[in-house]
Amino acid sequence: MEVLKEKVEEEEAAEREEAAERAERGEKTKRPMEVRREETTMTQEMLRDLERKLSEIEVSVPEKLLAFTKDTIDTSKLPLSYQSNTLKEEHLLQVADNFSRQYSHLCPDRVPLFLHPLNECEVPKFVSTTIRPTLMPYPELYNWDTCAQFISDFLSMVPLPDPLKPPLYLYSSTTVLKYQKGNCFDFSTLLCSMLIGAGYDAYCVNGYGSQDLCHMDLTREVCPLTMKPKESVKEEEKAPPKKYAIKPPRDLTSRFEQEQEMKRQEAIKAEEENRRKQEEARLLEQENAKTDPLHGLRVHSWVLVLSGKREVPESFFIDPFTARSYSTQDDHFLGIESLWNHKNYWVNMQDCWNCCKDLVFDLGDPVRWEYLLLGTDKPFLSLTEEEDEGMNDDDDVENLGKEDEDKSFDMPPSWVEQIEISPEAFETRCPNGKKVIQYKRAKLEKWAPYLNNNGLVCRLTTYEDLECTKTLEMKEWYQNREDMLELKHINKITGLNVDYFKPGHPQALRVHSYKSMQPEMDRVMEFYETARVDGLIKREETPKTMTEHYQGRPDFLSYRHVNFGPRMKKLALNSAESNPRPMVKITERFFRNPAKPADEDVAERVFLIAEERIQLRYHCRSDHITANKREFLRRTEVDSKGNKIIMTPDMCISFEVEPMEHTKKLLYQYEAMMKLKNEEKLSRHQAWESELEVLEILKLREEEEEAHTLTISIYDTKRNEKCKEYREAMERVLHEEHLRQVEAQLDYLAPFLAQLPPGEKLTRWQAVRLKDECLNDFKQRLIDKANLIQARFEKETQELQKKQQWYQENQVTLTPEDEDLYLSYCSQAMFRIRILEQRLSRHKELAPLKYLALEEKLYKDPRLVELLKVFV
């Protein structure tokens, strides 16, 4: 303490000296500054320069730590179980205190047990009663991984007040869910409650963790979304060599040169691997340069899931902050003091010198785990042979059972209310709808559905360096998009964009890879072939070529490759519709058609449009090693003089494995060439249509990206405008029907009959006066209602005119947001004006009818009908 006081006094003296020096410098510079102010005047250019310099200054606002204390919790509306203890709970607290005293006496070097912290009402509650097993109604929360991920996203982490001690307060899960904040013990309690409700054998653990684990620091961890799944390489089964297979030619390359080349390649790989390992070691050394002075002392809480229930094959840990699962031998977990569930409490009696690697989670072993209560489940109870032999005596068994019954004490029910998560909260997930997680060379951002106008729900940004300054690539996940966009992958280095779509796009688009949205650029489009009539699977486009792959077509077309030549120069804008690119070559390939013989089934045909040639290659028969080929010289049907050109043998060059008589005839060759001419026209037309389709898809994608409309389910009544309007209309109809019923039950003569003496019989003149007063009063009310509607109509009109005048005066300086607000106000104002106008016109039409209807009712009223007969 004396050393601390001396340090404080030295710091105060240094601050006083520094303040005195600052004051002296201020006095010295005060007068020259005043002289300068008098001499220099600030011009407009100097002011603009100063404003520019000031705008470049960035002020960093320190982030406020999340505060979650008792003072921030409203305890006025909490139920009685939160504010007091039952007799059974008080008995349990006494048992826990007795257990704690015995434990402290037997283990004086161990820290005090975490048994009964205070709740939000400052009432001591045993930790096991804070767990409320609950099965949530959402299927996603039935498995441990998705349940832990939901809690990690839904809550915000608050660090422990003292990193070396467990918290003094342990709040209920309902309070934690309400405020969406909590420390590691709050996270673990909520997660354990939901896992036990889902059928898992889960326990809350009070122990010690690493600094990264306690601070939820993932900057040294690799993001799971960046790790690529390991591809299992399937070894190709080598076909057995055929008996009469052709032997490969003899290899005449030097074996010595091959060995030297292999050694050189291995040396290069070893050098690269060594360099990579050195770089990783250097980076790891930089990351671990700052050792934690509190290593092994930081208190942390997590969840233990034991094997057995829900087909869990092996026990594991769950960190509630990150929702990650770890082995029970992981280095992040440095020791365990105790653990508990909703039935019992266990104290770890094993040594944690080797972290948690040597711990045995046999909770039925009283040597390793000291339990608090008797008469509860003891999982994995394993008895030694000596104990088993000692338990053979029937009398001892009966006596032991009686003693256990006398000493057993059941755990009281949980004092926490039923844990409930509303559908809105379950959908929103993250606090305020957004959460950011920083990983090693990556940043993960999450949003709630419908929070962003473009449907963005997740974004993963990967960086090249540890400081996260140079972006490598971005992945963005979308939901509820009308264009079925699911994932957008942007590579910042190559500039390649890849869009992934779910089934349902208007053009059956599945994947779209591109660097620019301009037409006739490098791009790849993949389609859902089952949703297209033409069976198109993939289309690859470059400035000079276009390649299409097909499947399941009736003509067995599988491949089409089009080569384009330079476009003819025109003054108008070049496009596939106005000035298409000239096609130079079209190559088409076909699957095997089993209905045709292989000699007549075309496998590939090439239209050399510029050279006026057509090349055909047929499928190869199974018993042949070569295939038939033909080449046609396509000429014009008439010459320059108009004479018809006759088919000649030199116009068809063919190679046939087994020549046939009918294929040599000129008529057969002429008919084949005429058919190929028509097919060439069809292929050129289909290629031109493909170009137009690309333009249509690009235009559609630009419109979709600009509009980014979101779809809303018909069952989502809060967001679906049509359902909302229909519901409001139904409510309005029911309200009007209710008003009509109330109006029918009203006694319209009651206010006027009350003015007469009670029990007096009406005279004829009194009846006439009552009728007139009632009609006059109703007429006045109709007039007042019309005046009220007219006044509201005029008020809305004047306010709209003022707003329009304000817009005309400030139109130049308005921002796009202000213009959107103005247009929205005008739309709403016009809607209100139109409704008021309709109400006024309707009131004018119905007022006379209502007046006549009331007059008729008065004449038919049984109290006046006899007295008013004379006037009818």
Curated annotation (Swiss-Prot):
Coiled coil location: 1-64, 254-292, 676-706, 780-805
Entries under Pfam families matching the protein: CEPT76_peptidase (PF24656), DRC7_C (PF24671), MORN_DRC7 (PF24667)
Record keywords, A-Z: Cell projection, Cilium, Coiled coil, Cytoplasm, Cytoskeleton, Differentiation, Flagellum, Spermatogenesis
Main location class: other
Superkingdom of the source species: Eukaryota
Subcellular location: Cell projection, Cilium, Flagellum; Cytoplasm, Cytoskeleton, Cilium axoneme; Cytoplasm, Cytoskeleton, Flagellum axoneme
Quaternary structure, from the entry: Component of the nexin-dynein regulatory complex (N-DRC). Interacts with TCTE1/DRC5. Interacts with DRC3 and GAS8/DRC4.
Protein name (Swiss-Prot/TrEMBL): Dynein regulatory complex subunit 7
Naturally occurring in which organism (per UniProt): Bos taurus
Organism ancestry: Eukaryota, Metazoa, Chordata, Craniata, Vertebrata
Gene, per the UniProt record: DRC7
